[in-house]
UniProtKB/Swiss-Prot annotation:
Gene3D superfamilies on file: Helical scaffold and wing domains of SecA, P-loop containing nucleotide triphosphate hydrolases, SecA, preprotein cross-linking domain
Name of the protein this chain belongs to: Protein translocase subunit SecA
Annotated positions binding ATP: Q87, G105, E106, G107, K108, T109, D512
Family of this protein: Belongs to the SecA family.
Alphabetized UniProt keyword annotations: ATP-binding, Cell inner membrane, Cell membrane, Cytoplasm, Membrane, Metal-binding, Nucleotide-binding, Protein transport, Translocase, Translocation, Transport, Zinc
Annotated cofactor note: May bind 1 zinc ion per subunit.
Predominant localisation class: membrane
Residue ranges of the region described as Disordered: 861-893
C-alpha cells in the first residue's frame, strides 16, 4: 500500500544508485580538460603512475575518476569515440561487481573498456567473456589499439590453440575468450602433471558480455572433459527399430481415452513415460529381438541399462524433432540453442540421447563417453574474486542473478529516449490465420518501403514463412542455423529500405541492424576503395537512412512468443536503437506451443465467449497478461531446474575444491616424501585395525588375513604368526610399531636402490595418476547416484539429503582409496640401480603399467530418470576429449590428453 508512495518520494533503488553514480561522473568530467591537454606520451604514462599509486596503498575506487577520464580521452584519440555520461555509469556498475542492463546500440563494448582498464591496473588479469569465438576476436581486435595505447597487453584464448600461445594470452593484462574455453582451461589445469602445463592465473575479475545468456541460459549445461567408454552402437540401432511400433496413449482433459497406446507425453515437463501396456509390449519385443531373456523384467538390476536405452530412443523419436531441436549437417547431429537459434558444435546430449538421435537419423553412432573432469558455469564463475556482466535484457531475471550469483542488476538510462512503438499482441484461432495476417502486415510495410524483420522460434517456422512469401512473390532473405555463413551479409543490409529478413533467434543477439544498411560493410566489400568512393557510399547511405526514418524505422514482426520474456525483448530490441523510430508486433495463435501447453484454456474460453470468427484476431490486455503469466510460469520452472542443478552440483563442487587443492599442492611441492610416509602409516593402521580390532584379545586376531593383506598392499611377506609364537610380550601396540618399522625399512632399501631424487619424482607422478583415476571413477559414481536418487522419495526420504549423505560417504572412501592405492603401487614397484635417465624412464613406465592394471571400478546401474524438475537428456558441453587409446602413440604425435603438446613433451615424459 505504501510502496508506491515511498517510491514516489525517494525513487526506486535503481534511480538512487544512478543518482549516487552521477556524483562520480561529475568528478570524471572535471578531469576531462586536464586530460585533453596531455600529450599521447603523457596520457600513456598515466598507466604506470596508477600502478605505482596502487603499490603505495591507494585503492581502485580512489583511482576510478581519473582512470575513467584517461580511458575516455584515449577512446577519443584512438577510436574516435567519447564515452557518454551514461556509459561512465555503466563502467562504474561493472567495476562494482554488478550487471549493467543497456539497450541495443548503447555501446556495451565501449562501456566495458572503462572497468577493464581500471581493474587491469592491479596486474592480476581481467577476463572478458563472450558467447562465441567470433565475438571474442572481434571485440579484442576492435579494442586492442585502445588498450595497447594505454600500455596494456591483450590476449585471446581459443580452442586448439598452441599451449605457448594460450599461456601468453592468459599472462596478458586483458584476456578475451568464450565461456566454454575459460571453463575447459580451468578443468585442463586441474588435470595437468606439472605447474608448467597450467594456463590460468588466479581468477581475479571477469566481465561477461551477454551475461544472461551465459549465466542463465547456459547454466543447465555442465562442462565435461571426457574420454571414450564402451561402444553400444549396435544396441542403439536395435532399439531404434522397435520404437516406431509403440503408439501414444491420448486422453482428453475430462479423462476420456481417445487413443489407447503404450506411452504418454507431458509437453510441459518434456517427459515421456511408458505405461503398463507399454512396458509389457516393449519387453515382448526385446525378448523377440534377443535383447531380453524370456520372462525377465526390464526393471531387474542387470537390465536397467537396457531400460535407459529404451527411454533414450523414445525421447529421441517423440521429443526431439529435426529442424526444431537439432539439424543434421555433414553426417552429424548439431543441437540448436533455443535461446540464440545457433547450432552448438561439440555439444552433445547426455544419457545416451544423442546416440539415440543419431540412430533415428541413420547416422554413424559415436561412442559413449566417460567423464574425466566436470564443472558447471554456475560454479566456475563463482570462483572469480569479482564478477560483472552486460546485457540488453537482465531485469526480468534480477532475482536469479542475486540469489545464485550475488549480482545486482542496474538498469543504465539510455543516452537517447526510446522511440519504438510496441503494439499489443494479436491472437488468432489457428496458425494459418496468423500466417495470413503476418503476410498482410509485411505487404503493408513493404509498400511504405520500411525494412521488416520477421522473428521465428524454429528453423522449421522460418522455412515455412519463406515458402509462404515465395508463393506471394515477395523477395526476402532467410537467416537461420542452416545458412549462418551468410549472417554478416544478411544482417548488414537488414535495415535497408524495403529489406525483408526472416530470422530465428540468431538475429536477437550480438547484432546491430543499422537503418539504411551498413555503409562500412559496403566499403569493406571494395578492394582498396578511394576516398571519393567512401564519401559517395556514406552520402548514399545517409539518404537511405533518412528515408527509412521517415517511413517509421525497422518493423519487427514475431511469429510467436518464446518461453522466456527475455528472448522476446531481445527481438524487440533490434528495432529502435539509439533513439531511432521503429515498431514491433507479436502474432500468436492458439496452436502455438506456448499457448497450447500453458495458456490455451483460459484464452480459448475467452475467445469463445466473444464469438470469434475465422480470420478475426483479438487484441486485448487480458490476453497479453495471460501469455505473460504463462511465460512467468515457464521461467519459474526453468529457474527451479537451474537452482536444483546448483544445489546438487554444490555438493560435488565442495569435493572438487578439495581434490583440486590437493592436486595443486602436489604440483607445487618439490618433495612429497613426508606425505607418502604419512599415507603409509595411515594405510598400515587401517589394514591392521581391519584384522586386529582395537583392544581385542589375541584369540580374536585374524593373523593369516593380516599377512595376506600386507603382502597384497605392501608387497612384503612377514611371519607375524611366528613372531607371536616366539614373543609372548608382542601386544597390539608393539606389533603395530614392529610392522611399521619393517615396512619403512623395506621402502628405505628401495630408496637406496633407486636413488632418492628419482623416487621422489616417481612418487609424485604415481600419486597424481592414482588421484586422477579414482576421481574419474568417483565422478561416474556420483553421476549414477544423482540420476537414481529421486527414487528415495518413494521411501519418504528427502532425495537431496540422501544425496548429500551418500556422496559424503563416497568421498571419504575416495580419500582412503587414494592413500591405499598409492602405497600399493609404490610398494609393488621393483627398482635397481641404473643410468639415471634410463632409471627414471623405467620407473615411470612401471608406474603407468601398474596404475593401468588396477581396477578402479564401481558397481553401478544407470539411473532411470532425474527428478521431476531436472532436464531430461541435459546437454553437456564436451571439450576436445583427452581420449586414452591402447595403441602406442608416436613421440611426435599430439598427446592423448588434449593439451596440444607433442606426446614426448607431455604424458610421454612419464611413460
Amino acid at each position: 500500500m505504501f510502496a508506491p508512495l515511498l517510491k514516489k518520494l525517494f525513487g526506486s533503488k535503481n534511480e538512487r544508485e544512478v543518482k549516487r553514480m552521477l556524483k562520480t561522473v561529475s568528478i570524471v568530467n572535471a578531469f576531462e580538460e586536464k586530460m585533453v591537454a596531455l600529450s599521447d606520451e603523457q596520457l600513456r604514462g598515466k598507466t604506470a603512475e596508477f600502478k605505482e599509486r596502487l603499490a603505495k596503498g591507494e585503492t581502485l575506487d580512489q583511482l576510478l575518476p581519473e582512470a575513467f577520464a584517461v580511458a575516455r580521452e584515449a577512446g577519443k584519440r584512438v577510436m574516435g569515440m567519447r564515452h557518454f555520461d551514461v556509459q561512465l555509469i555503466g563502467g562504474m556498475t561493472l567495476h562494482e561487481g554488478m550487471i549493467a542492463e543497456m539497450r541495443t546500440g548503447e555501446g556495451k563494448t565501449l562501456v566495458g573498456t572503462l572497468a577493464v582498464y581500471l581493474n587491469a591496473l592491479s596486474g592480476k588479469g581481467v577476463h572478458v567473456v563472450t558467447v562465441n569465438d567470433y565475438l571474442a576476436r572481434r571485440d579484442a581486435n576492435w579494442m586492442r589499439p585502445l588498450y595497447e595505447f594505454l600500455g596494456l597487453s591483450v590476449g585471446i584464448v581459443s580452442a586448439f590453440q598452441p599451449p605457448e600461445e594460450k599461456r601468453a594470452a592468459y599472462a596478458a593484462d586483458i584476456t578475451y575468450g568464450t565461456n566454454n574455453e575459460f571453463g575447459f582451461d580451468y578443468l585442463r589445469d586441474n588435470m595437468a602433471f606439472s605447474q608448467d602445463e597450467k594456463f590460468q592465473r588466479e581468477l581475479n575479475f571477469a566481465v561477461i558480455d551477454e551475461v544472461d545468456s551465459i549465466l542463465i541460459d547456459e547454466a543447465r549445461t555442465p562442462l565435461i572433459i571426457s574420454g571414450q567408454a564402451e561402444d553400444s552402437s549396435k544396441l542403439y540401432i536395435e532399439i531404434n527399430r522397435l520404437i516406431p511400433r509403440l503408439t501414444q496413449h491420448i486422453e482428453e482433459v475430462e479423462g476420456q481415452v481417445t487413443q489407447e497406446g503404450h506411452f504418454t507425453i507431458d509437453e510441459k515437463s518434456r517427459q515421456v513415460e511408458l505405461n503398463e501396456a507399454g512396458h509389457q509390449f516393449i519387453e515382448e519385443m526385446l525378448a523377440q529381438a534377443g535383447l531380453l531373456a524370456e520372462g525377465e523384467s526390464l526393471y531387474s538390476a542387470h537390465n536397467l541399462g537396457l531400460l535407459t536405452h529404451v527411454y533414450a530412443g523414445l525421447r529421441a523419436h517423440k521429443l526431439f524433432h529435426r529442424n526444431v531441436e537439432y539439424i543434421v549437417q555433414d553426417g552429424q547431429v548439431l543441437l540448436i540453442d533455443e535461446h540464440t537459434g545457433r547450432t552448438m558444435p561439440g555439444r552433445r546430449l547426455s544419457e545416451g540421447l544423442h546416440q539415440a538421435i543419431e540412430a533415428k537419423e541413420n547416422l554413424n553412432i559415436q561412442a559413449e563417453s566417460q567423464t574425466l573432469a566436470s564443472t558447471t558455469f554456475q560454479n566456475y564463475f563463482r570462483l572469480y574474486t569479482k564478477l560483472s556482466g552486460m546485457t540488453g535484457t537482465a531485469d526480468t531475471e534480477a532475482f536469479e542473478f542475486q540469489s545464485i550469483y550475488g549480482l545486482n542488476v542496474m538498469v543504465i538510462p539510455p543516452n537517447k529516449p526510446l522511440a519504438r512503438k510496441d503494439y499489443n499482441d494479436l491472437v488468432y484461432l489457428t496458425a494459418d490465420e496468423k500466417y495470413a495476417a503476418i503476410i498482410a502486415d509485411i505487404k503493408e510495410s513493404m509498400k511504405l518501403g520500411r525494412p521488416v524483420l520477421v522473428g521465428t522460434a524454429t528453423i522449421e517456422t522460418s522455412e515455412h514463412m519463406s515458402n509462404l512469401l515465395k508463393k506471394e512473390g515477395i523477395d526476402h532473405k532467410v537467416l537461420n542455423a542452416k545458412y549462418h555463413e551468410k549472417e554478416a551479409e544478411i544482417i548488414a543490409q537488414a535495415g535497408a529500405p524495403g529489406a525483408l529478413t526472416i530470422a530465428t533467434n540468431m538475429a536477437g543477439r550480438g547484432t546491430d541492424i543499422l537503418l539504411g544498411g551498413n555503409w562500412e560493410a559496403e566499403v569493406a566489400a571494395l578492394e582498396n576503395p578511394t576516398a571519393e568512393q567512401i564519401a559517395q557510399i556514406k552520402a548514399d547511405w545517409q539518404k537511405r537512412h533518412q528515408q527509412v526514418i521517415e517511413t517509421g524505422g525497422l518493423h519487427v514482426i514475431a511469429s510467436e512468443r518464446h518461453e522466456s520474456r527475455r528472448i522476446d525483448n531481445q527481438l524487440r530490441g533490434r528495432s529502435g536503437r539509439q533513439g531511432d523510430p521503429g515498431s514491433s508486433r507479436f502474432y500468436l495463435s492458439l496452436e502455438d506451443s506456448l499457448m497450447r501447453i500453458f495458456a490455451s484454456d483460459r484464452v480459448k474460453n475467452f475467445m469463445k465467449a466473444l464469438g470469434m470468427q475465422s480470420g478475426e484476431a483479438i487484441e486485448h490486455r487480458m490476453v497479453t497478461n495471460a501469455i505473460e503469466k504463462a511465460q512467468r510460469k515457464v521461467e519459474g520452472r526453468n529457474f527451479d531446474i537451474r537452482k536444483q542443478l546448483l544445489e546438487y552440483d554444490d555438493v560435488a563442487n565442495e569435493q572438487r575444491k578439495v581434490i583440486y587443492h590437493m592436486r595443486n599442492s602436489l604440483l607445487a611441492a618439490e618433495n612429497i616424501g613426508d606425505t607418502i610416509v604419512e599415507f603409509r602409516k595411515e594405510v598400515l593402521d587401517a589394514t591392521i585395525s581391519q584384522h586386529i580390532p582395537p583392544q581385542s584379545l589375541p584369540e580374536q586376531w585374524d593373523v593369516a588375513g593380516l599377512e595376506a593383506s600386507l603382502a597384497s598392499d605392501f608387497a612384503i611377506k612377514l611371519p607375524i604368526q611366528q613372531w607371536l609364537d616366539e614373543d609372548d610380550h608382542l601386544y597390539e601396540e608393539t606389533l603395530r610399531e614392529k610392522l611399521l618399522s619393517e615396512i619403512t625399512t623395506a621402502y628405505t632399501e628401495k630408496e637406496d636402490q633407486a636413488g632418492l631424487d628419482a623416487l621422489r619424482t616417481f612418487e609424485k607422478q604415481i600419486l597424481l595418476r592414482v588421484l586422477d583415476d579414482l576421481w574419474k571413477d568417483h565422478l561416474s559414481t556420483m553421476d549414477h547416484l544423482r540420476h537414481g536418487i529421486h527414487l528415495r522419495g518413494y521411501a519418504q526420504k528427502n532425495p537431496k539429503q540422501e544425496y548429500k549423505r551418500e556422496s559424503f560417504s563416497l568421498f571419504q572412501e575416495l580419500l582412503e582409496s587414494i592413500k591405499r592405492d598409492t602405497i600399493r603401487v609404490l610398494s609393488h614397484v621393483q627398482v635397481r640401480r641404473e643410468d639415471p635417465a634410463e632409471e627414471e624412464a623405467r620407473l615411470r613406465r612401471e608406474a603407468e603399467e601398474l596404475a593401468s592394471r588396477m581396477q578402479f571400478q564401481h558397481a553401478a546401474a544407470p539411473g532411470l530418470e532425474s527428478e521431476q524438475l531436472s532436464e531430461e537428456g541435459a546437454e553437456v558441453a564436451v571439450a576436445s576429449a583427452p581420449v586414452r587409446n591402447d595403441q602406442k602413440l608416436g613421440r611426435n604425435e599430439p598427446c592423448w590428453c588434449g593439451s596440444g603438446k607433442k606426446f614426448k613433451h607431455c604424458h610421454g615424459q612419464i611413460e
